[in-house]
Amino acid sequence: MFIGEYNHAVDTKGRVSIPAKFREELGEHFILTKGLDNCLFIYSSDEWGILENKLKQLPMTNKDARAFVRFFFSGASECELDSQGRIRIPANLREHALLEKEAIIIGVGTRVEIWSNVEWEKYNSDDNLSYDEIANKMAELGI
């Protein structure tokens, strides 16, 4: 399981270090794709396979399902770590996540997310999140 929050620099070639705690669980090859909320998602090959199977089951006749599948797969890139534990984030994905010099890498259970430090701060602002509202919604879901 991926947990925690880490700050890392993004170099001029678009490379960022993946926290050592995440590397082993991700394995040698994994998938980087566009995420929601202006971030990127990283899935291990196993988790990607599970998600891929679920997405394949969506009805092609549903416009929203087609749009989501396109969004998710068109932004996907197979990745592997270099000898220094870094990945190179393609330009289109850096643009999607508004990544510049600093990245926040967080563990979110079955996936890793990469955020620009600016977007992460905005997301976590009091104006954006009400933890009481979120807690109430989770209670409605039985959590």
Curated annotation (Swiss-Prot):
Entry GO CC: cytoplasm; nucleoid
Keywords for this protein: Cytoplasm, DNA-binding, Repeat, Transcription, Transcription regulation
Subcellular location per the Swiss-Prot or TrEMBL entry: Cytoplasm, Nucleoid
Domain SpoVT-AbrB: 5-47, 76-119
Keyword Transcription: yes
Transmembrane regions listed in the UniProt entry: none
GO BP: negative regulation of DNA-templated transcription initiation
GO molecular function, one term: transcription cis-regulatory region binding
Keyword match Transmembrane helix: no
HAMAP family cross-referenced by the UniProt entry: MraZ
Subunit structure as annotated in this protein's UniProt entry: Forms oligomers.
Protein name: Transcriptional regulator MraZ
Organism per entry: Alkaliphilus oremlandii (strain OhILAs)
